[in-house]
């Protein structure tokens, strides 16, 4: 039986990977070929992405796969959402893309609502959760500042599209990544021209929109000559990593919610079309583009970012923990010592995350955690309770009964948090695959190659190849009591 080989570049906000996927009949295998860091650059008070370093790492990934001497069918790239690069008339990138955690957009959302368009009107047009860093507020800020990049740009390319441009020389706007921008109409699946008009941004700044599965172009001759490799097509997968991840949920029907767990936690349900009404407006729910015409009705939640930043601070102080050690510390710590709201603005990008947690506790009249184990446990418990808070909203919004929660992404390997989550929500949790973005990326390339035809066929293949972990709810009374305390704290 012939095998097909696909390269997935899966780039997150803290690291990137080159994954070689091999599909032989229904058997899918993944091999991590390279892994590399992705860190925000801090320059003169701003935060940027080093897109040139990312491009170099893509080249290293291609060279490493070439050593394996397998016939590669295609390449796909997925990244985090909202951020973008500018390209000038000569086709050169202008500077470095701003990172979504850059402080320049703080307060701009409220200013936009006051001076340009109300929050409700903007939500009615886009169905997207209002967040400071959405592309629309980044562009609003850059326009006000007469930013050099925007002023001299011929094209705006979202991050996966910018990287595929560097590989192919072809420019596209992939639908799922564009849907994170808060510039698209979810009904027409096109850019909202009225929004572009009020921003003072020309529609010509954006390349043609393509759906997941479209061919972008071939690797450039120069690149192939430099790396001594054959040219292969680059496919527009679901460029938003969460869209690729949700496509990899091993579900047999629609009676589920999903949680894509990583630096960010994205919880939601899959719908056949956008849901924009009073309830979604009130709860600030987002309608992002999915595969095969679906909508990812979801809520962005601060995820493992808080614990990652605690680990970073402790590393500077000379203490390092492996993942199992971290979970062991949390398990041994006292339960429900205090509660935090993971989405509190104080946790967005502080210099010292443990200090930010202590300040939150002081502000809400709680005793702060005392040990590293307590800090970690407080974060995990608070995340689980946050998931219950948000899932209750989706129970209201879903036309289908929610019978289980599928946790996908790197955070699905955290068995303690998975159990806490099952306890908090009172539903079974199905955890895995942890490599959901890469698997979705690869299977969308397989779909483009004609190996599978539909999203459900993709999921059927994935189901055969993953062995998820199952968690059943326990200690209902204890967790219900903790939830009431959590709610009272976050309202302070």
Residue ranges of model-derived segments:
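Glycine-rich beta-strand-to-loop/alpha-helix junction loops that act as flexible
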Residues: 78-81, 212-213, 261-264, 404-412
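Short glycine/proline- and acidic residue-enriched helix-loop micro-motifs
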Residues: 44-47, 119-129, 205
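Carbohydrate-associated surface elements
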Residues: 102
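Active-site core segments that coordinate phosphate-bearing ligands/cofactors
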Residues: 2, 7-8, 20, 113-126, ...
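Short beta-strand-loop/turn "lid" adjacent to the catalytic site in phosphate-handling enzymes
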Residues: 43, 63, 67-99, 129-133, ...
